[in-house]
Amino acid sequence: ALGYAFDFEWSNQNLFYGQYRRSASYYTNSEMASSGLTSEAELKYLEPLKDQLPPGVFTTEFQVPISDGSGNLRSQLRQAGALLSAAGWKVDANSRKRVNSAGESFSFEILLVSPAFERIVLPFKKNLERLGIGMSVRVVDPSQYVNRLRSFDFDMVVTVIGQSLSPGNEQREFWHSESADLEGSRNLMGIRNPAVDQLVESLIAAPNRQELIIRTKALDRALLWNYYLIPH
């Protein structure tokens, strides 16, 4: 739902002069990136985990929300609102804030390492406010930022997750449950997902390059469809 509130097309056009192409894979710009519908080769590793994965993995090409770049997100925000309501986050009639059944408001903090990022996240904040979601922005110095990332002391951050052209053992540190609480690991999303764990181990055990590509694409799909981040 939050992804619908990030207007990449408007930001790219108005803040970056159209210089960026949005990522749609954890392994973007490589032969490891998934695309289109799931292939038969990938299904070999995904089908046994069908009960643990979102249905879209098997039926639909993954796509991030796309706007017309005008800044008018009414349609996307309507979709986001429907998803939030379905998940139990209703708009309170008095405060106009999103609250759950316990009366808790939907709010979080985004942690930044540089004031330069504020111009990127403030339009996002404004769109979230229209949904009844509160987002505060905190900018800290580099040393504090690194320490807070290492100890997972944040709600949301803006970051880049760089990947090798030959993924291997290091994938456990990014996505595996065993790294979710390991201070200093690169599992910043705190992923604890048995299906993802299994796909990571399968990737590491790939006997050749072709199998590595197939298994990485399968993992990529599982990560994308679980919406652990908002691609930018």
Predicted regions and their residues:
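Short helices/loops that flank or line small-molecule/ion binding pockets
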Residues: 122-131, 143-154
